[in-house]
Amino acid sequence: MSFTVYPALDIRNGRVVRLLQGDYARETQYGDDVLPRAQAFADAGAQWMHLVDLDAAKAGGYTLAGTLGEIARATGLRVQTGGGVRSREDVARILDAGAARVVIGSLAVRNSEMVVGWLQEFGADRLTIALDTRQDANGIWQLPVHGWTETADATLDQLAVRYAQSGLQHLLCTDIARDGMLSGPNMALYAHLRALTPQLQVQVSGGARNLADVAAAKAAGCAGIVLGKALLEGHLHLEEALAC
């Protein structure tokens, strides 16, 4: 299995931002130079990037179609993108706008039956399921929903197995406790997922801070790693991560 580094840009109100643990009240802004940053990813040698519409993630209705198309045309990057995907029409529109792969988050928890149908319709290589998880006091990986204020009926393990058995290829998993914290990914979580669903291509997300974290993700047999804050704040250089 090849290993892919996904430099990431989260967009809110036209600006590149990062949220601490997904909290919209704890936002850091990095400017509105979205296309130049994407071009810099390509210039560094990246093949892919990860693009998140934070406005849509909150309110629904993907808003970055124009930006997505511009990035894809200008840079040649393959873009994995999502935020606010609520319907089949959303998926089709984002793919038509130039996405290589559409990320489906909360809907994948709320309505797995519908999303499994999309895997068959659009092709498993065109969709990534993104699951945000938090470990409870009993060590069970739960799936917080509705702005992380409630917990889904299904656990991470149950949903990962269900999707793996339904033909899913790409799973992006974020440990909420690590997101934006530069504290290192929770590699125990990813080792657990790899053992539970070895057929899935698991992407590491949340907490990456240095080359050792990239190397650890690769050594664990994960398919890729999403790099956000560490790149934006210069803790990690993309060229080095790509060469890792």
From Swiss-Prot:
Catalytic activity: 1-(5-phospho-beta-D-ribosyl)-5-[(5-phospho-beta-D-ribosylamino)methylideneamino]imidazole-4-carboxamide = 5-[(5-phospho-1-deoxy-D-ribulos-1-ylimino)methylamino]-1-(5-phospho-beta-D-ribosyl)imidazole-4-carboxamide
Isomerase keyword on record: yes
Alphabetized InterPro entries for the sequence: Aldolase_TIM, His_biosynth, HisA_bact_arch, Isoase_HisA-like, Isoase_HisA-like_bact, RibuloseP-bd_barrel
Gene Ontology CC: cytoplasm
A GO molecular-function annotation: 1-(5-phosphoribosyl)-5-[(5-phosphoribosylamino)methylideneamino]imidazole-4-carboxamide isomerase activity
GO biological process, alphabetically ordered: L-histidine biosynthetic process; L-tryptophan biosynthetic process
E.C. code: 5.3.1.16
Protein name: 1-(5-phosphoribosyl)-5-[(5-phosphoribosylamino)methylideneamino] imidazole-4-carboxamide isomerase
Species assigned in the record: Xanthomonas euvesicatoria pv. vesicatoria (strain 85-10)
